Design a protein with these regions (language model features):
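N-terminal beta1-alpha1-beta2 module of alpha/beta enzyme domains
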Residues: 1-87, 188
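Conserved, mostly hydrophobic/aromatic
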Residues: 3, 61, 80, 112, ...
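Hydrophobic faces of well-ordered beta-strands that scaffold small-molecule active sites
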Residues: 3-7, 57-59, 89-92, 120-124, ...
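An alpha-helical appendage that flanks or caps ligand/catalytic pockets
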Residues: 4-31, 143-179, 219-346, 383-385
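Internal, glycine-rich beta/alpha segment that forms the wall or movable "lid"
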Residues: 15-17, 34, 98-206, 219-224, ...
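Active-site mouth loops of central-metabolism enzymes
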Residues: 26-41, 93-103, 184-194, 249-252, ...
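Short, acidic/polar
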Residues: 38-49, 108, 194-201, 334-342
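Glycine-rich, proline-tolerant flexible connector loops at the mouths of alpha/beta enzymes
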Residues: 58-76, 96, 130-133, 214-216, ...
Length: 385
């Protein structure tokens, strides 16, 4: 079991005056650079602590949003590749679905893999819907573009005998010959995220690490679809190292203090999706089936507890989120028991993506929660392997 400390690096003051949208069109005059600088230093201090405590590290990127100041994940990866000593560095994800230049992606990630001496984990995603307009990209056919970018990046990383040309539907290159090549051969491990059975099966066919983000007790069918796809290629059943799950985390010495921290983290979950309606679902981003489901009132934000109770993540209380395995919250013993029960439900889980900081959770609360987890929970999870 590997546990990755994660924060989206939010700018919490924006929640006090967002005017109905935290993403895309919130004026950047509401971002004070001195405050942002302090926040960046704080988040990197927490990641360095994670490295010392035995966590691995996860980073992501989003654009034009107060919910995530990581507007280019390469900056964070570069800093941590040099400053950390042992942690695996996971990017989940790199939004190659709306990136115009996969050659640059291949160069950047290869360089980071070398600087870190082989500690990079590459997670590729298509990108969230409200970032396509501000990246000047068309969401129609995004998955075709995603897979072509993916194929090009892998070819660029694994071609070592001089330049090659590329003529695709979306990308055209001459004399591709990246320097440096990756440290890990043939390339760093590949991850992606899945939220549908079809995508889960496809990732299983490719054998990539599949991350499921906060789906609670709707996760097992996705893992089972992955297993079917994985074994359809003539392989034995996949091990736990092929499966990852992202959950919120709040640990404290007492249950009451943990729940106070959990409420601060949960409020970020409830409110982080506030965005001006025209940006929420650009034409072509979702499939016909997904849009039909939305029109029929099938909410995408709902999940289930283990006993089948429906939980709406936009309004759920702390106990609902704990029961749905969206939030792991409590004393070290309670959190360990919650995670162990969820692992048992999934049939095996090798990577826990721990969102241990979000929203208004302070630096001191974050450090204390991480330290308790790192010293009292993490060793017990590793012993379960």
């Amino acid at each position: 079991m590997r546990v990755y400390h994660f924060t989206e690096q939010p700018y919490p003051d924006a929640w006090n005056d967002h005017g109905g949208s935290l993403r895309v069109n919130l004026p950047n005059r509401k971002c004070e650079p001195a405050v942002a600088a302090d926040l960046y230093h704080r988040f990197y201090d927490e990641w360095l602590l994670a490295d010392e405590l035995g966590f691995d590290i996860m980073l992501n990127e989003h654009h034009q949003t107060a919910t995530c100041m990581s507007s280019t994940v390469v900056v964070g990866l570069s800093i941590l590749a040099r400053e950390t000593k042992r942690a695996r560095l996971l990017v989940l994800g790199y939004p190659i679905g709306h990136r115009p230049d996969p050659l640059r992606v291949a160069e950047e990630l290869s360089t980071i893999d070398v600087i870190s001496r082989g500690r990079l984990e590459m997670g590729f995603i298509k990108g969230v819907p409200y970032e396509f307009p501000c990246s000047n990209q068309n969401p129609v056919g995004v998955m075709d573009k995603f897979w072509e970018a993916h194929d090009f990046i892998i070819k660029a990383m694994t071609s070592h005998d001089g330049p090659f040309n590329w003529e695709g539907q979306f990308f055209h290159y001459r004399n591709v010959n990246i320097w440096p090549r990756p440290w890990q051969q043939p390339h760093p491990p590949i991850w992606s995220a899945a939220g549908s059975l079809g995508n889960a099966r496809m990732l299983g066919e490719r054998g990539y690490v599949m991350a499921v983000l906060g789906s609670g007790y709707k996760t097992r069918p996705l893992y089972d679809a992955y297993r079917e796809g994985y074994m359809s290629q003539g392989r034995p059943a996949p091990g736990p190292d092929r499966f990852a799950y992202l959950g919120l985390m709040a640990v404290a010495a007492s249950e009451s203090e943990a729940r106070r921290r959990g409420e601060l983290v949960a409020e970020y979950l409830r409110s982080g999706g506030i965005v001006w309606p025209p940006f929420r679902n650009p034409p072509g981003y979702l499939s016909v089936e997904e849009n039909t489901g939305i029109l029929m009132g099938r909410a995408r934000e709902r999940t289930l507890t283990r006993d089948g109770r429906v939980v709406d993540m936009r309004s759920a209380d702390i106990q609902d989120l704990i029961d749905a395995a969206i939030l792991f919250c409590g004393t070290p013993d309670q959190v360990h028991a919650q995670i162990a029960a969820f692992i048992d439900y999934t049939g095996g889980l090798g990577h826990l993506l721990s969102m241990g900081q979000a929203g208004f959770l302070s630096h001191q609360d974050t450090v204390d929660s991480m330290t308790l987890f790192g010293k009292e929970v993490l060793p017990r999870l590793k012993a379960m392997d």
